[in-house]
Amino acid sequence: MSVSFENKETNRGVLTFTISQDQIKPELDRVFKSVKKSLNVPGFRKGHLPRPIFDQKFGEEALYQDAMNALLPNAYEAAVKEAGLEVVAQPKIDVTSMEKGQDWVITAEVVTKPEVKLGDYKNLEVSVDVEKEVTDADVEERIERERNNLAELVIKEAAAENGDTVVIDFVGSIDGVEFDGGKGENFSLGLGSGQFIPGFEDQLVGHSAGETVDVIVTFPEDYQAEDLAGKEAKFVTTIHEVKAKEVPALDDELAKDIDEEVETLADLKEKYRKELAAAKEETYKDAVEGAAIDTAVENAEIVELPEEMIHEEVHRSVNEFLGNLQRQGINPDMYFQITGTTQEDLHNQYQAEAESRTKTNLVIEAVAKAEGFDASEEEIQKEVEQLAADYNMEVAQVQNLLSADMLKHDITIKKAVELITSTATVK
């Protein structure tokens, strides 16, 4: 194989390489054996056409495209490796010569990884706005949240207040004409929940069971039903019941109802304090890691970030998100339907942060390279087993999905992140 690379501009160039006749001839033979099985040529049994007759009738060139399709991927990969390139986007391939009896010549316009000039990335001073201490208020807030989850709705005689639930019938109309979807019976509506369009729930506050209220509202300009958007409507609303939330007493019995592993309210508070402390510690560590990496990226200089890398990052992020949905048993089409979004919306969402993520990835990779980080066979095996456990997969499945090089890359990246983070100090 002959390989050459010519720089055209920063992070771009043309890779020229050949596929030798030593590789071409056996591949042409393989393609011919496959093709002749389906050939019907008068005077010959199907699948028994001699090669010289094929070449005479169809020309050896008829086999070239299939042979090229088979040979090109490995030839390109070998050429990239021999040229010592780190290609970061799909190449633009052009077959420049496929002469009979000659080596085939291919050119590939490639985008290469930009140079990263590292600044300080160890022993950084960072600031984080995360509180590690667990306060009594934190514990009480969590208990109160669980207490409210156990609350019951009881009928009240007094007028409805925000936070109450009303059971209502309603009939909506615009200019005296009822519209589709504007009617409901025995509907439970939490006042202040924001379930209905703005202004609806507020107009029921202060009214009691048995009353009928004319609720006048205006549909938002961006309302999903375009025929209703921006229009004023009247909802004749009858209140059947007003219910208030009744929370259980704050005592040992409540504690046992919340968590069967505790006996007293004091036990529950202590358990929650430990859990909150662990969660806050994790949040604090994440904040330090993020701040340290951001600082390392700010200290580095990246020589002209290729636009193609940003596109690749968006594509990777979208695929990762959709893959996670499917692993959770969620159909992507159903997700888009429920959220009222499209794949283009998802693409645009990741586009906004792709440049920052790409720069971060480049700097971390540069740190791993500068430190000479590698991954042992033992570390790779441990990583495979951890991924299998995390995603409830068989070890063999993970090994089939991820190459050793991919796993090694992930491990060295983790080591670089750990180095940046562990040597950082918080101001």
From Swiss-Prot:
Residues 163-248 form the PPIase FKBP-type domain. The keyword Chaperone applies. InterPro entries: PPIase_dom_sf, PPIase_FKBP_dom, Trig_fac, Trigger_fac_C, Trigger_fac_C_sf, Trigger_fac_ribosome-bd_bac, Trigger_fac_ribosome-bd_sf, Trigger_fact/SurA_dom_sf. The keyword Metal-binding does not apply. Consists of 3 domains; the N-terminus binds the ribosome, the middle domain has PPIase activity, while the C-terminus has intrinsic chaperone activity on its own. This is Trigger factor. It comes from Streptococcus pneumoniae serotype 2 (strain D39 / NCTC 7466). Its EC number is 5.2.1.8. PROSITE patterns: FKBP_PPIASE (PS50059). GO terms for cellular component: cytoplasm. It comes from the Bacteria. It is found in: Cytoplasm. Gene3D superfamilies: 3.10.50.40, Trigger factor ribosome-binding domain, Trigger factor, C-terminal domain. NCBIfam families: tig. It catalyses: [protein]-peptidylproline (omega=180) = [protein]-peptidylproline (omega=0). GO terms for biological process: 'de novo' cotranslational protein folding; cell division; chaperone-mediated protein folding; protein transport; protein unfolding. Involved in protein export. Acts as a chaperone by maintaining the newly synthesized protein in an open conformation. Functions as a peptidyl-prolyl cis-trans isomerase. The gene is tig. Keywords: Cell cycle, Cell division, Chaperone, Cytoplasm, Isomerase, Rotamase. Belongs to the FKBP-type PPIase family. Tig subfamily. It is an enzyme of class 5 (isomerase). One of its GO terms (molecular function) is ribosome binding.
